[in-house]
Amino acid sequence: MKPIDGVSLSNLCDYSFGDQSGSFGNVPGHFMKPANLLNLEFVERILSNTNEYMTLFIDNIRLYKREIESVKPQDRSYVNSLMEESDLLSLCSKFPDKKFIIFTNLEDTSIDDFIFDKIPDNVLSINAVNAISFGNNVNPIPYGIQRKLNVNDNRVDILLSMIDRNIEPQGLLYVNHSVHTNPEERSGINELFLDKSWAKVEVSLVNYQEYLSSLKKSKFMICPIGNAVDCHRNWECLYMRRVPVMKRNKYFEYLLKDYPVLFVNNYSKVTEDLLISNQHLFEQMQRINLDGLDIQKFYDKIVNDSI
C-alpha cells in the first residue's frame, strides 16, 4: 500500500506543471512550470509522445482562468498573475490531435462551475481535489495525505508503519483539529465533547505518532472542513480504518460513497448512543478493501476509465 499524496500523483503523470503552493512555501522538491505555449519543454514532449493520450498534473488555480471569490484581498494580485501566465485547459485546446487526462492536487482552491465552459473536447477527464463542482468529465478525487514539508518531515513513514498495526479501540470518538484554520466551521466542536467520557479531545498539539495512535484507539473521528473543503485528516482516518464523522455535504457523500462514513446534520447531534448504534460502520471499515486508496491502483483506474 502506497497512500495517495499530491507529489506521488504528480510523479506518476506523463508531464507535471508542478504546483504553486509548493513553490510559494519553498517545500522540498518544489517546482512550477508555466502552462502556456512558451513552455517549450511541454511542447516538445507533446510532439515526441506517440500515445493517443497524455496524463498531466497541475494545481487547481492554474488549471483554468476565472474569478476566484475565496481569494484573500492580499493574495489576489499573486493569484491573478498565476492565471495570467498559465491556463492548462486553454493550452490543451492548442493540441486538438492529442487527448489529455488531467490530475490536480496540492491545492486548497476549489473547482467551480466556470470550469464547464472551459473544457476542450480533447480533455477526456479532469480529476481534481476540492472539485465541489463536478459532473460529466470533472471528477472529485481524494486529497490524500500531507506531503513532506521539510527535510525532517517523516509523517509518511510514520503513517505507513501504523497502517497495519493492530490497536484495539478503547473509546468511541477522537477529536483533534486546529480551530484557527476554519473558525466558522470548527469553533465550538471541542466544547461539545470535552466532558464526555466516551470521547478524547486533544486541546493541544501532539506529535504525529501520538496522533495516529490516539486515532486508532477510537472507532470514530470528527472530521470538519478546514482550509479547503477536503482535508488530509479524512484520508488519515480511512487509512487507519476508523470512521470519519462529517457534516452532511453532497461533495463528500459522492467522494466517499465507497467508504463507511457517519454523516450528521450538525456535530451537536453526535452522542454516545448514535455512535454505538453505528457500530456496523466500524465493523465494515475493518473489512473494506482499501486498494482504491493505493496511489498506483487509484491512478491506473482513473486512466482506464477515461480512455
Residue spans for each PLM region:
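Conserved acidic donor-binding segment of nucleotide-sugar-dependent glycosyltransferases
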Residues: 261-267
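Nucleotide-sugar donor-binding catalytic core of glycosyltransferases
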Residues: 1-235, 239, 243-259, 274, ...
